């Protein structure tokens, strides 16, 4: 097992933090022992039109979750209108374009005007409460306007990441039965143009029910036009009126659908509802990031992913925060871009993914040295377990040992952060998601579904409902029950493995299907990956299992080296020795394949499912590859595979 290093939080952090360790323990205890009282108190963070008749009616055996039944509220009112009196002239969205010369600040008053105009324009085009609207946009302010305008009139948005192919977009439009699409002529990313309108046109060739397409003019590029269906966004909103009354919504009315890839079959449309989701996003944003008035918060995600929904748009704006929206990529025009943006906008809280950090770590410290980053107070990690090496680089180099790191674990299906250290309440451990958020009751179960007490490793499950819980898979409720509630009756099944240490802290070890059983030893792939990337020559590693004649399963590692490193047998021997030292000789990879790049989704997650197929020589059906950022990577790995 790894040596666990602990980083006590600096006295300055503890003294200024909103919560003490005692506060956390007291509030957590109340949240699990008396959840109705706790959540009724937390719900005061929102403005309600009508109070609830019951706080919750939930049953994890069936997946039923109803929170704040009978209550009414409006999401856009909570994110905009209620702030106008006190902070109408404060910045709400700070936009940084792909080109460093492009940026703009949008106040809460301007946000209100833009959202109302678009909401009125949508109503004029026949969009009404309950209708589904597909949003296929670049990272520009209009993407947030579109989401909020839907919530204002009670339409259900389905945001599709702008990197998805026309086929993937088509499938999502058809699955949600969207009649309206909001898009842009083109997107801009890393200096390149992305043909969004062209992709929409291709998708809509198979979607005859779509009657309305609003198009934002982002680049002014030439686009094809279908009269009667297509309308320029600026023309639709020009005379639409600056006020649109917010539609009162039931707490359990659907708010949005967000598609997440299933390991098999078509993507799942995860459905979230209005009251519970907004409370989860609002509370976790405030508590986890210890947000203080006037601070600049930057989540580097795209609004096409749940992280962008919860921590670019809804969580920050419901709290009256300043939220930075970034159109670009970490390495354009060069690899100091993130840190240049931090200095330019005096960012206080920075929330990004381990994949981005590992890529930047690979470039060394020179890109950091051209910037000050003195404005930073808190750092966050999201999307996958962060390996200790990347954590330490983030803490020591990016945050200059001043900024605590909140290593957050959650999922599209949970709506908001579930496990995380809180600023000032405990020591930090590199790579450890530590403690549950209020109201979250994690448990570990063995293969037979038996509870594991004390330190141990097993399947991570949640034993009581929380407000941000998934309510359904759109159009296929049984699929939700089968996926999340059938595998472990009475629990929400996360699909992730975890271990609990002697302090009771949780370490995410990777997906359950990322556990390899070698000669009876259960090995978490994340642990082997963390050992491999401890080597100075290794930039990234992905580990999967494959059938082994003697051991049942063997360990197959795909390893990407640092720039300038030529992989050879000496490096291979050093890596095997490192895994032996860090975990044990039983965890040593049988096969190490040098990989110039790994297959990743456009959100930066490694597609381990494809790597497993390559390692197992199962090449006839690689499954859905539409989410890959660079599909050509896969063929290169197949050609050089070691298990032929």
Curated annotation (Swiss-Prot):
Keyword annotations of the record: Acetylation, ATP-binding, Ligase, Magnesium, Metal-binding, Nucleotide-binding
Any single GO CC term annotated in Swiss-Prot or TrEMBL for this entry: cytosol
Described purpose of this protein according to its UniProt entry: Catalyzes the conversion of acetate into acetyl-CoA (AcCoA), an essential intermediate at the junction of anabolic and catabolic pathways. AcsA undergoes a two-step reaction. In the first half reaction, AcsA combines acetate with ATP to form acetyl-adenylate (AcAMP) intermediate. In the second half reaction, it can then transfer the acetyl group from AcAMP to the sulfhydryl group of CoA, forming the product AcCoA.
Names of the cofactor(s): Mg(2+)
Gene Ontology molecular function: any one: acetate-CoA ligase activity
Entries under InterPro entries matching the protein: Ac_CoA_lig, ACAS_N, AMP-bd_C, AMP-bd_C_sf, AMP-binding_CS, AMP-dep_synth/lig_dom, ANL_N_sf
Binding site for Mg(2+): 533, 535, 538
Modified residues (N6-acetyllysine): 605
Tagged with keyword Chaperone: no
Binding site for CoA: 189-192, 307, 331, 519
Organism encoding this protein: Pseudomonas putida (strain ATCC 47054 / DSM 6125 / CFBP 8728 / NCIMB 11950 / KT2440)
Ligand binding (ATP): 383-385, 407-412, 496, 511, 522
Keyword set includes Protein biosynthesis: no
The name this protein goes by in its record: Acetyl-coenzyme A synthetase 2
Post-translational modification: Acetylated. Deacetylation by the SIR2-homolog deacetylase activates the enzyme.
GO BP annotations listed: acetyl-CoA biosynthetic process from acetate
E.C. number(s) listed in UniProt: 6.2.1.1
């Amino acid at each position: 097992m790894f040596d666990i290093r602990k980083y006590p939080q600096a006295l300055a952090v503890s003294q200024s933090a909103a919560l003490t360790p005692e506060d956390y323990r007291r509030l957590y205890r109340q949240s699990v022992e008396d959840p109705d009282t706790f959540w009724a108190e937390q719900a005061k963070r929102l403005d309600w039109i009508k109070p609830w008749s019951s706080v919750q009616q939930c049953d994890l055996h069936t997946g039923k979750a109803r929170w704040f039944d009978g209550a009414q509220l409006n999401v856009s009112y909570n994110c905009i209108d209620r702030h106008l009196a006190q902070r109408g002239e404060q910045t709400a969205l700070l936009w940084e374009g792909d080109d460093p010369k492009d940026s703009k600040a949008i106040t809460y008053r301007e946000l209100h005007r833009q959202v109302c105009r678009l909401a009125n324009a949508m109503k004029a085009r026949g969009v009404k409460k309950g209708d589904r609207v597909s949003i296929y946009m670049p990272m520009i302010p209009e993407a947030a306007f579109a989401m909020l305008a839907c919530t204002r009139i009670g339409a259900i948005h389905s945001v599709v990441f702008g990197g998805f192919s026309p086929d993937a977009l088509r499938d999502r439009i058809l699955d949600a039965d969207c009649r309206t699409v909001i898009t842009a002529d083109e997107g801009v990313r890393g200096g390149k143009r992305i043909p969004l309108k062209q992709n929409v046109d291709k998708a809509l060739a198979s979607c005859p029910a779509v009657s309305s397409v609003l198009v934002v003019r982002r680049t002014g590029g030439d686009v094809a036009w279908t009269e009667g269906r297509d309308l320029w966004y600026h023309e639709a909103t020009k005379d639409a009126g600056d006020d649109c009354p917010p539609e009162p919504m039931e707490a359990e009315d659907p708010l949005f659908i967000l598609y997440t890839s299933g390991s098999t079959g078509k993507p799942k449309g995860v459905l979230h509802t209005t009251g519970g989701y907004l409370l989860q996003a609002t509370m976790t944003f405030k508590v986890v990031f210890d947000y203080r008035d006037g601070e600049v918060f930057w989540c580097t995600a795209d609004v096409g992913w749940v992280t962008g929904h919860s921590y670019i748009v809804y969580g920050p704006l419901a709290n009256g925060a300043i939220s930075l929206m970034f159109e670009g990529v970490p390495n354009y025009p060069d690899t100091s871009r993130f840190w240049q943006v931090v200095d330019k906008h005096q960012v206080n809280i920075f929330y990004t993914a381990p994949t981005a950090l590992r890529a930047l770590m690979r470039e060394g410290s020179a890109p950091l040295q051209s910037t000050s980053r003195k404005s930073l107070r808190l750092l966050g990690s999201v999307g996958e377990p962060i390996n200790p090496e990347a954590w330490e680089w983030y803490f020591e180099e990016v945050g200059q040992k001043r900024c605590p790191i909140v290593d957050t674990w959650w999922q599209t299906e949970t709506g908001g952060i579930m496990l995380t250290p809180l600023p000032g309440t405990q020591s930090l451990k590199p790579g450890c998601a530590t403690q549950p958020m209020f109201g979250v009751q994690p448990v570990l179960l063995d293969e037979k579904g038996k509870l594991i007490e004390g330190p141990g490793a097993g399947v991570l499950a949640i034993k009581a409902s929380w407000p941000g819980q998934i309510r359904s898979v759109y159009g296929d409720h049984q699929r939700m029950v089968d996926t999340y509630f059938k595998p472990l009756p009475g629990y929400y099944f996360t699909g992730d493995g975890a271990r609990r240490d002697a302090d009771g802290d949780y370490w995410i070890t990777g997906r359950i299907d990322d556990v390899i059983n070698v000669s009876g030893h259960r090995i978490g792939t994340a642990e082997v990956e963390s050992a491999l990337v401890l080597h100075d020559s290794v930039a990234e590693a992905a580990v999967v299992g494959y059938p082994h004649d003697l051991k049942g399963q063997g360990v197959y590692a795909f390893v990407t080296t640092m720039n300038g490193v030529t992989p050879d047998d000496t490096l291979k021997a050093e890596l095997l020795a490192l895994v032996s030292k860090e975990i044990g000789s039983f965890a040593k990879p049988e096969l190490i394949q040098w990989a110039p790049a790994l297959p990743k989704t456009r959100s930066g997650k490694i597609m381990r499912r494809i790597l497993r197929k390559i390692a197992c020589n199962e090449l006839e059906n690689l499954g859905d590859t539409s989410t890959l950022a660079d599909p050509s990577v896969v063929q290169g790995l197949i050609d050089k595979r070691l298990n032929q």
